[in-house]
């Protein structure tokens, strides 16, 4: 379903792949109330915590536009309202 590059939700800045214009990224953080250790079930899709604690998962899809700025494909306003709080300007795809 997803293509390269595989970008982890954790790590040190500057050590992963370079994100460039033309990429589409699925950002999929997961959190659990207990152990951070997880396993994938036999269906090769379902992820559970090893201690069976409750968890949550959500996804947003981003396009990196030709101007190098992001556009959130899963947000009606392209992510403008939420990303502005962090000083991030989105691409002008809605203009």
Description of each model-found segment:
Residues 11-95:
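Charged, cofactor-coupling segments
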